């Protein structure tokens, strides 16, 4: 049994608790304003907060987090935190730039795309009129009353069944009466479902749908399958209708999804969890604020008055096509506060060194460093991950750009399940975001340093250690650990430090190469063997146990490729018994010869595939070296961009650009490098 309004009620309660300061476990300080919030909600919405909280887990000093007020303004953060809890963003001409920069800093990718679209077209979906809002509120209350009535019927049926079980039944007739008393509710459910399927089969024969039988359904109420007056008071009103099937083309005529006025964005941002575990393929992705409902309607003439209050607006919207978002737009003049060049800088996003065409404006790649959404491209939502709750579920992030599917701001509910993992990976090269395959939780995969180059050949591999994980040679090998595969222990000997070292003890066997990792603390990271500056690192936790796949390891250990299996799988005859997520493999000599600049960078690895630049710390892959370097600054805390007047440093060039134009009073355009103008 599904409860359609459950997610909505939960977030309403969470927002109420936030506004009243109840059960809040963190305080976000922006300037002179304090925002109470819940860690779990912030971490679910923003990978930036998730990285902070995962590193500082158990640290009471992290209960108060201070954000840079020059990058994130208090007004912009207030709008963003309201969006996190309500999925509604107050966006207007006066605050779009501040919201864009704050969302880029906090890695709220869906908000960044909404702001970019607004800056490009100066249009957003209009909010519903006040009359419609009132009507939707009334319908939500009516739906809530129907749900309460359905729950009371369920409880009464359960009580009657318990009473029937307690009464002794020596005679067969009394046993039959008890059975009849226990089973009317399940029998009625089965009968109604069968009748619903027959009606759908009859409707498939009709070429079109009578639009007079379909009207608007409130986005706020839960899905309700309605057929007649008695079904309003049956527990079936709590049951969500069957999910649309990929092969049922004509089902679009009677199973319709509520859409809004305008669509944009990519399908990867329009995901919410399925409320039914039996849907694994294509699914209708619903927004939290708009709660798009699928309405199963019958077309009997006598049931028309009841259906008119629970009906749909767009009856023939195909599955996987355009989905929409809800944004409340302020009524402000549409005059642009920035010149066209700056708008094009914000809306551009280059892949490599190529030019990108955004809404008819061709933008060159040299201006990409100015984009306030640079951190969005360098730390986007994970393309794939494994969710371990009892068993392993593959979370599929669909990237189908052919449908121009739509953008949804409710990024705190992106858990649509899928089984086709390879189809997800085939579309990675088409999406504008340049990151893939990362999780910042305890099971997050990230690269560990390889074994040191042994002098005695393959036999000297066991017991070898790494001198420095960040200054290894170009032809080094790397691995991706996952957890709880072979049951090997991992001993943590020190805390998480900026220059910590991962020692690896290898033991070869006939089926695989197993490793036991132990973290060894080295000396001061500013001296000795470590030749890189010391920065604060935000990185995921070390997995507890790990296993290495060795099916592709040659005999020469100096050129071997160590790959980590991404899923829990056993090995038989040197081959995995079940497929896992794709592994990173070291790039060939030809690719390495073309990427000499990347080999000189710390924490950058060159791998095979279209995304050939990988972060050594967390295994994220990127199309361009610039994006990879920007992402690494999230881990290291490096701030390479300094203001020439006041000396303040920033991690992104867009942050320096805003600081120079708004807060640094001594700024002059002639003193900035040409790349920032």
Swiss-Prot record:
Biased composition range(s): Polar residues? 158-181, 287-300, 552-576
Zinc finger (C2H2-type) residue ranges?
A: 613-635, 641-664
Does this entry carry the keyword Lyase? no
- Cross-link (Glycyl lysine isopeptide (Lys-Gly) (interchain with G-Cter in SUMO2)) at residue(s): 239, 322, 330, 404, 415, 541, 594, 597, 645, 658
Q: Where is the composition biased (Basic and acidic residues)?
A: 366-379
Domain BTB as annotated: residue spans: 24-93
Q: Which SUPFAM superfamilies match?
A: beta-beta-alpha zinc fingers, POZ domain
Ranges of biased composition (kind: Low complexity)? 350-365, 449-464
On this chain, the residues bearing Phosphoserine are 234, 371
For the region Disordered, give the residue spans.
Answer: 158-252, 287-312, 331-387, 447-474, 552-585
Tell me which GO cellular component terms the UniProt record holds.
Answer: chromatin; nucleus
Chief site of localization:
nucleus
Give one GO term, molecular function aspect: zinc ion binding
Transmembrane as a keyword of this entry, yes or no, is no
Which Pfam families does the UniProt record give? BTB (PF00651)
Q: Which GO terms describe its biological process?
A: negative regulation of transcription by RNA polymerase II; regulation of transcription by RNA polymerase II
Instruction: Report the protein's function.
Output: May be involved in transcriptional regulation.
Protein name from the UniProt record: Zinc finger and BTB domain-containing protein 5
Q: Which organism's genome codes for this protein?
A: Homo sapiens (Human)
